[in-house]
Regions:
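N-terminal cap/leader regions of alpha/beta-hydrolase-fold enzymes
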Residues: 1-280
Length: 280
């Protein structure tokens, strides 16, 4: 697995609210489970950003999808305990921010760089594609075959690091009923998009540092021209990479885009996942 695509993959705002779900071992993986207030309309498996399944941001998002859409939501530890610690965000902010003094430049920033590398390099080694892809695919197959969940429609919601895998799941018949990917990274154009065969919704900003706006327009055009699969690509004005998960609540524009992208995902799953149990 290559290095994170841009600085925005490792920066953002970390929420402090307390998630309300539970943690269980499901199909061999520790999993955060968000249970809806009513009978579930379907099941959504979240594939998180680079900071993994334990962050408040991802867990609170799982709670919202569950409560607002009546979905059972699974957020598994696909990284097997190797996600960079949330403090990596602060390290990246410090490295990229202005230096208030010469001492910061010549002493502290080199230390922060070493600390950052000590978190990022092990993640890259332990979460290369050959390791995590089978883990992700096997989990979805297990959900499909589990008598407790086989009757539910299955959606995949991937963010940043996880967006790529959601899109790849949508390239396989029978893996998921539909997918939603927010600001995906490490995508190949056009092949990753040409292979999609399940309903796919994409949310991305027009100032995303991973997929530039020219490439976004190419993706829009390619998917709009395909009549063999349901898809949508929504471009959010002024939204940065990571906005759907790590938007700073003090930034009105980023927060608005995050809320709208969540609504987008719920509308998509409402069309293609809710009540679709047993349809592979």
């Amino acid at each position: 697995m290559a290095a994170p695509s841009c600085k925005n993959c490792l920066t953002g705002y970390m929420k402090t609210e307390k998630p309300t779900g539970t943690v269980s071992t499901i199909h061999g993986l520790e999993t955060y489970v968000a249970t809806p207030p009513n009978a579930p309309q379907g099941l959504i498996v979240m594939i998180p950003d680079i900071f993994g399944w334990e962050t408040n941001n991802s867990r609170l998002l799982a709670d919202s999808l569950s409560q607002d859409g009546d979905y059972l939501v699974y957020l598994p530890d696909f990284m097997n305990g190797t996600a960079p610690p949330p403090g990596t965000m602060e390290l990246m902010d410090s490295l990229l921010g202005p230096s208030p003094s010469l001492a910061t430049t010549i002493f502290y920033k080199p230390i922060w760089a070493v600390q950052f590398a000590s978190a990022a390099i092990p993640f890259m080694a332990r979460n290369r594609d050959a390791v995590v892809r089978p883990r992700i695919y096997d989990f979805h197959r297990a959900v499909r075959s589990d008598a407790a969940t086989a009757h539910l429609g299955l959606g995949s919601a991937g963010y940043c690091w996880g967006g790529k895998y959601t899109i790849h799941l949508c390239q396989e018949e029978g893996m998921v009923d539909a997918g939603f990917a927010a600001h995906p990274s490490k995508m190949a154009f056009p092949e990753d998009w040409e292979k999609v065969c399940r309903p796919l919704s994409v949310a991305i900003g027009d100032v995303d540092m991973v997929i530039g706006i020219e490439d976004v327009r190419k993706i829009e055009g390619l998917m709009a021209g395909r009549k063999d699969v349901e898809s949508e690509v929504r471009v959010y004005e002024g939204a940065k990479h990571g906005f759907a998960v790590r938007a700073d609540p003090r930034d009105e524009g980023q927060t608005r885009s995050a809320v709208e992208s969540q609504r987008q995902s719920l509308e998509w799953f409402g069309r293609f996942v809710a009540g679709k149990g047993g349809k592979k």
